[in-house]
From Swiss-Prot:
SMART domains: FN3
Cytoplasmic side: 760-962
Protein name: Oncostatin-M-specific receptor subunit beta
Organism of provenance: Rattus norvegicus
Extracellular side: 29-738
Positions bearing carbohydrate: 219, 324, 492, 578, 723
């Protein structure tokens, strides 16, 4: 039994050993697997050759074989490419392989052959190839007419950056062929007399219409031969590919497509995009370049794996994403948003969101004001929500915004839903910042009130007006109220010198602000304080002061923003109680402008008191103008200069003094004068008037009959005034100056004498030789009175008339007033008798005037009794009509006296002066038109005898006074 087992084992081992020995002999020999090429198909447009071959001697089921392929051009000995191709070959299987030529296949004949070698793990490595197959000729050439030039490839499509070889097949009658790429010349390689190759590397995209290649032969026709290269932009991979849902019914997939590769002439359409979902196996072509909508079915999965492929005629590009549907939720915007204001500071907001079962959204609420987010809050929402905004400003426009996103897996916020609203107005919350300016005019206070506009947060609405209540502290029950319409920021009041309290408040549609108080004392506007000079800093002033009292509750600093213009634009700054310095800055401050500051102290009673004045410049500048100068006291050796001052507020700096420049030919400077050289190299003398209050200077030690030039210019810490044109002055000579000193006083004396004589000539004439003396105006009468001689006064009873004259009154003439004041209107004859007749005695009689004459007593005493009356130019009744009653006596006296003066004094020694009583009737300036019945009567005036020594004097005095 044991022997049998051993025998079987030995037999098995011998059989295995025999099989291995047989296999070693077979595998050790090289396998002769010579390929056989069956067909070669060409695709000229792609410059591709597709080979098909088999291995006739292949008897195995499957082996991995390496094929070596050799390609020659134009002749078999001109090998242009050798390469290996490894593949698994099955029994009686046809092998396929594709080769792309670097030149168009139409340009040359190609030859292809193949050999093989087993490369399989079942066999030991082979050291030799099989035999070569027979050459397979690949010929796509076309015949070329003698006068034709063929260019290949024709209308080739390729990507930007590719390399391409252009083949020129030249007819036998053509030579010296030149080509251009667009307008640039290109050169090629001459393979033979009828074949040339032009290699273009890294071609660029020029335009969608393609790139032109044009060729022309020198000896040929004028025809141009060419082709077009359609260069496409490189197809890009889609970017930012993502998918999301807004309603769990559709998936919206978006991507960035990149550059469009469309070419003209339908050579290439725009790339198209395909979506493939691997779990469901669905494939859909998008109708858009950058988006696609994927429908979600009820039985769709929650996880998706998408591949997006972009494809054109030249290549494909793909990207993939995978996601869970609940993680890609992009909610729609909230809807039904409402806002209701609650008072002036609150607003209530409500909204709804799209609902899906128990799906929770997180909503973000924002409140914006003037484009800025002032409040933000998050709210969890299922279907609807609300929110209350508080601490809002009255009369302010707000914008409430809300958006939502998935609460569990945040992906994207929804679009904002916005709603604008405005809160209602409220009464102003702050009192006005008020200031005043007080001045005294004509015994009254002229008060100018100023206030600053409230900030928007303080006004709480549109300010409509300002209320002003003026309360007289002397009589509190008396108050006046004024209203100033907005947007005015001030007003003027005229008040007496009593103390007043002025209450000011701002009003809007909702109410009034707290009152601001201005207190005026009786001495407001009369404060006199010290004014000091300060130095400015950059863009402002550092102002400090000494406290006056210990009970100050604050200070106010005010100034004019435009001190050199009529518009002051008063500004002020409030300072706390324990602060005695502040920095005033303003963009309105300018160099070279003086600013005046006043510091006021506020008391507990709201009284303000001026404690200090300060003035200064942010930057002093040199004076821009020189003062006007006049010359005085010009002598041969000196003259005086006097210049004007100008307003300090218009100075560009603090005037420290004046420089006086003097030019002369001698160039010799007086003592205290400095010899200096100006920037224009001119040499002159300079004198420094270092007292700015001094406005005069006497220049001495000059030469007579010499020309001098001078200039007066002010200077500040920044420099002196402009170097303007000098004023010329010539000193007179000594003799002419002395002569002038003599002639001028004499001329002045003569001139004054002439004026005095002319002024007194009329007086001398009246005193020395009057035309008609007036005894009533003469001083002789006063002499007579002073003597009080009663015999010089003539009584009526002593007067015997020499002539009685009856004055007729024409019919219809005006009624005359007589001495008694009674009227007589009866007609009288044209020639009245000297005495009344009997016939007329019974009837009405005219009033009789009896003239009494003043006579010269000396003439009477001498015994000369002749009576020579002077001619009367005007009768009494004529004078009565032409002159008022109170003037009648003077008229008669003047005329009569004139007639006497004209008569020679030798012819008469007795001079009679008529003294006719003036009529008196009520109104002595007018005659009565309806007089009462006349009463007959006559009246004598007293007559007086004048001594002869006084007659002439009386006449002269009368003439002067008349």
């Amino acid at each position: 039994m044991a022997f049998s087992v051993v025998l079987h084992q030995v037999t098995f081992l011998l059989a295995v050993l025999s099989l291995r020995t047989s296999q070693s002999k077979v595998l050790g020999e090289p396998l002769q697997l010579t390929p056989e090429i069956h067909t070669v198909s060409l695709q000229s447009a792609l410059q591709e050759a597709n080979l098909e071959w088999t291995v006739p001697t292949f008897s195995h089921q499957e082996l991995n074989i390496v094929f070596q392929i050799e390609i020659s051009r134009m002749r078999t000995s001109n090998t242009i490419w050798v390469g290996n191709y490894s593949t698994t070959v099955k029994h009686e299987e046809t092998v396929h392989w594709k080769w792309t030529s670097d030149i168009p296949l139409e340009c040359a004949t190609h030859f292809i052959r193949i050999r093989a070698m087993v490369d399989d793990a079942q066999y030991p490595p082979q050291s030799s190839w099989s035999n070569w197959s027979s050459w397979k000729e690949v010929n796509a050439q076309v015949s070329v007419p003698p006068d034709t030039l063929l260019i290949f490839p024709e209308d080739r499509l390729l990507e930007e950056g590719s390399n391409v070889t252009i083949c020129l097949m030249i007819g036998q009658n053509l030579y010296n062929v030149s080509c251009k790429l667009q307008e640039e010349p290109i050169r090629g390689e001459q393979l033979d007399s009828h074949l040339s190759l032009i290699k273009l590397n890294n071609v660029v995209f020029l335009n969608n219409a393609g790139t032109n290649i044009n060729c022309k032969a020198m000896n040929g026709t004028k025809n141009t031969f060419g082709t077009v290269l359609f260069v496409s932009k490189v197809l890009e991979e889609p970017k930012n590919f993502s998918c999301e849902t807004r309603d769990f019914k559709t998936l919206n997939c978006l991507w960035e497509p990149g550059i469009d590769t469309t070419l003209s002439w339908h050579k290439q359409r725009s790339q198209h995009y395909t979506l493939y979902e691997s779990f469901s196996g669905r494939r859909e072509v998008s109708n858009h370049r950058n988006s696609h909508t994927w429908q979600i079915t009820e039985d769709s999965q929650e996880t998706y794996n998408f591949t997006l492929t972009a494809e054109n005629n030249l290549r494909k590009r793909s990207v993939s994403i995978s996601f869970n549907l609940t993680h890609r939720v992009h909610p729609k915007a909230p809807h039904d948003v409402t806002l209701k204001t609650v008072g002036a500071t609150k607003a209530h907001m409500t909204w709804k969101v799209p609902s899906r079962g128990d799906y929770t959204l997180l909503c973000q609420v924002e409140l914006q004001c003037e484009g800025e987010v002032i409040h933000e809050h998050n709210v969890s929402v299922h279907t609807s929500a609300n929110y209350l905004f508080s601490d809002l400003e009255p009369d302010t426009e707000y914008k409430a915004c809300v958006r939502c996103a998935s609460a569990n897996h945040f992906w994207k916020w929804s679009d904002w839903m916005q709603k604008k609203f405005r809160t209602p107005e409220a009464a102003p919350s702050e009192a006005l910042d008020v200031w005043r300016d007080v001045r005294t005019e004509n015994g009254r206070h002229v008060v100018t009130l100023f206030w600053k506009p409230l900030l928007k947060s303080q006004a709480n609405g549109k300010i409509i007006s300002y209320n002003i209540v003026v309360e007289n502290e002397a009589n509190p029950t008396e108050s006046e109220q004024y209203s100033v319409r907005a947007p005015a920021l001030g007003t003027n009041l005229s008040l007496d010198l009593h103390p007043y309290k002025i209450h000011i408040s701002a009003n809007n549609s909702a109410g009034a602000s707290p009152e601001s108080l201005v207190v005026l004392s009786s001495h407001s506007g009369h404060e006199e304080v010290h004014e000091k000079t300060i130095k400015g800093i950059k863009n402002g002033f550092n102002i400090s002061w000494e406290p006056v009292s210990g009970d100050a509750i604050g200070y106010v600093v005010d100034w004019c923003a435009h001190s050199q213009t009529q518009r002051c634009d008063l500004q002020w700054k409030n300072v706390g109680p324990n602060i005695t310095s502040t920095i005033i800055t303003s963009d309105a401050f300018e160099p070279g402008v003086r600013y005046n500051f006043r510091i006021f102290e506020r008391s507990v009673e709201e009284n303000v008191r001026l404690v200090e004045k300060q003035r200064g410049y942010t930057q002093e500048l040199a004076p821009s103008v020189n003062p006007g100068v006049t010359i005085h006291n010009l002598t041969p050796n000196s003259f005086s200069l006097k210049w004007q001052d100008y307003a300090s507020d218009f100075q560009s700096g603090f005037i420290k003094g004046y420089l006086v420049y003097l030019k002369s030919k001698e160039l010799q400077c007086n003592p205290n004068w400095e010899r200096t050289v100006l920037s224009d190299k001119s040499v002159l003398c300079k004198y420094d008037v270092d007292d700015p209050e001094t406005k005069t200077l006497t220049v001495e030690n000059l030469r007579p009959e010499s020309l001098y030039e001078f200039l007066v210019t002010p200077y500040t810490s920044a420099g002196q005034g402009p170097n303007e044109t000098y004023t010329k002055v010539t000193t007179p000579d000594v003799r002419s100056h002395m002569l002038l000193q003599i002639i001028l006083p004499m001329t002045l004396g003569v001139f004054l004498s002439i004026i005095v004589c002319y002024w007194k000539s009329q007086w001398v004439k009246e005193k020395c030789y009057p035309d008609i003396p007036n005894p009533y105006k003469s001083s002789i009468l006063s002499l007579i009175k002073s003597k009080k001689n009663p015999h010089l006064i003539m009584n009526v009873k002593d007067c015997i008339p020499d002539v009685l004259e009856v004055i007729n009154k024409a019919e219809g003439s005006k009624t005359q007033c007589v001495g008694s004041g009674k009227l007589h209107t009866e007609d009288v004859p044209t020639k009245p008798p000297l005495v009344p007749t009997e016939k007329d005695s019974s009837g009405p009689m005219p009033f009789v005037f009896l003239e009494n004459f003043t006579y010269d007593q000396s003439a009477f005493d001498s015994g000369s009794h002749g009576f020579i009356p002077g001619p009367l130019k005007n009768t009494p009744h004529q004078l009565g009509l032409l002159a008022p009653p109170n003037k009648l006596q003077n008229v008669l006296e003047n005329d009569y006296m004139k007639s006497l003066v004209e008569s020679p004094t030798e012819e008469t020694s007795l001079i009679y002066v008529s003294q006719l009583a003036s009529p008196i009737c009520g109104d002595k300036d007018s005659l009565v038109t309806n007089p009462p019945m006349p009463v007959h009567g006559s009246e004598y005036k007293k007559q007086m005898a004048l001594p002869g020594s006084l007659t002439s004097a009386s006449l002269k005095e009368n003439n002067l006074t008349s």
